[in-house]
Amino acid sequence: MVRKIAIYGKGGIGKSTTTQNTVAAMAHFHDKKVFIHGCDPKADSTRLILHGKQQVTMMDTLREKGEDECTPDKVIEVGFGGVKCVESGGPEPGVGCAGRGVITAITLMEQHGVYEDDLDFVFFDVLGDVVCGGFAMPVRDGKADEIYVVASGEMMALYAANNICKGMVKYAEQSGVRLGGIICNSRNVDGELDLLQEFCDKIGTQLIHFVPRDNIVQKAEFQKKAVVDYDDTCNQALEYKELARKIIENENLVIPTPMTMDELEELTSKYGFLD
């Protein structure tokens, strides 16, 4: 049975990079059949898998050609490792609601039965926080079974992660969605690993993997490739291989217990953020 996973986190934390590198490792090292559904108006959730190809988005297709032309064969591309890719896209800048576009795109893909098409995993790469109903859809309506939050040892990254957990708690009972863990996309800040571990303990989940910072990620991006596509023998490729393995084998799925703002500030001040 296909597992549906949504990746959340603060804007700019590296969700799309982490998602694509993890998915590439799943396909390359673990022989998994994976589908990425980009849920960001920037439509950059699949560019490394597709070697920089600008994918036609579902919302552009709907606007320009209509729903009859917005079919899987017109909007899905296949990239590295046989990974299938689609981008929701969004409205024209300053017009309309991008969150509504996510709802429309996911619903259309479901109607076409795409997510059940002999897959092991579907990944929803979701924009930012869950303050908007459209971007909360994978949580609210049970479109995803598991949530992973990308964070770092920075105050605003933890603040966003905690807010995402609050959104999960609101909808977890009705949707059945659960938190699979926190992924640390390291920023090399002091005490980062210890801080993330303590944060995870307090919200009742696991630090599923600590991804170290490595310039090879940027080097691979310059070549428009995922790390495992660029060099599958390097240390960072093995980190993504390990993260992929942990997600594949993960059975520790929980409803989190978010911290209060006072508790979060107390935690971060312990590590010197509020000195």
Swiss-Prot record:
Essential cofactor(s): [4Fe-4S] cluster
Q: What UniProt keywords are attached to this protein's entry?
A: 4Fe-4S, ADP-ribosylation, ATP-binding, Iron, Iron-sulfur, Metal-binding, Nitrogen fixation, Nucleotide-binding, Oxidoreductase
- Listed binding positions for ATP are 9-16
InterPro entries hit by this protein: NifH/chlL_CS, NifH/frxC, Nitrogenase_Fe_NifH, P-loop_NTPase
One Gene Ontology molecular-function label:
metal ion binding
This chain's protein is named: Nitrogenase iron protein
Which HAMAP family does the entry mention?
NifH
The protein's matches in NCBIfam families, at most eight in alphabetical order, are given as: nifH
* Database matches in Pfam families: Fer4_NifH
The EC number(s) given in the record are: 1.18.6.1
